[in-house]
């Protein structure tokens, strides 16, 4: 279907440019029966495995190989000392690119994550990347390494710094190859929203085969933010492939939308969800046509809608992209790379996953604040992928002043600067 509702053929070939398409399409939806007992036994086994790996991750420093750290508070700090004990830092300090530890001292395993703020608690959902990293034969041409699917994890925190592991809330299925959550498949970029009408927590997740030819959007729901989530089914929204995704709930209307990388990643689709957030109304639109983007995130600031995403280069980082609009449906005005300074052309060696509103206050004069969350992928050892969290600032740039298109001219653009460490309670300084 086109944005006007008229059927159209997929303009992208099934076998497109491999570098631009880290994901591919497979047609069979499969039997979505859920084997609870065996899946949860598998989850417990994996949790025990995390404990055995803790010492290795806690003491080994790897982040200095991908970024030259610049200290903002101690000029003589060793560049290689990236595993500084938490008691040496302020309780509200975030160190991008370091190993984030949970309250038990274990490395946090929640990649490609999404966040939910509910009843004064933050919840972090993400992909568990553990075990051997390997490249299936079908993925060798574009470097599509992977680990077997374990499930979706959940952590909770009162302050964005101290995270408690709450379990594997959507585990993989080990004994049914036709299931969407089969452990040899893919479940990526989980995003969870709360539906006040149904009092349910709804998770959307990119479902795929290991060669990324399936390209579907899966949905699950729970009565609790810490699960367990019951898997419902997967879709091909608008009868098109759907890869990287995000879910956005409009603050003004509480209408929810699924935003997906579609048509072999050449176009983003915005699809309106039903009132229970688990299906589609049939209203949708194509945006960013021909721009080949993935890792989308959408957020509101005032009366404007902002988009941040990435280009398509597999696990390798590239320059982030941003855009602004007065409507979720567009038109969208691109604002360029929000990252500034050294390593901006690689998004500080990372890829966007979420923008989280974190309330008002701090040194920015009480305005609403936003956290840019990204993943620093390690394609040779995905379990050692790191997290890059940085504050977003807003400023009118020269490009904004020159922009004539609706939705862009004169509006403030999101700006992200690298900081080795920052205080989540009071981090916003002048650009």
PLM segments and residue spans:
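N-terminal targeting leaders characterized by basic, low-complexity, disordered sequences
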Residues: 1-14
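Carbohydrate-active catalytic/glycan-binding domains of CAZyme proteins
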Residues: 11, 16, 20-27, 36-43, ...
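Core hydrophobic alpha-helical transmembrane segments of single-pass membrane proteins
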Residues: 45-51
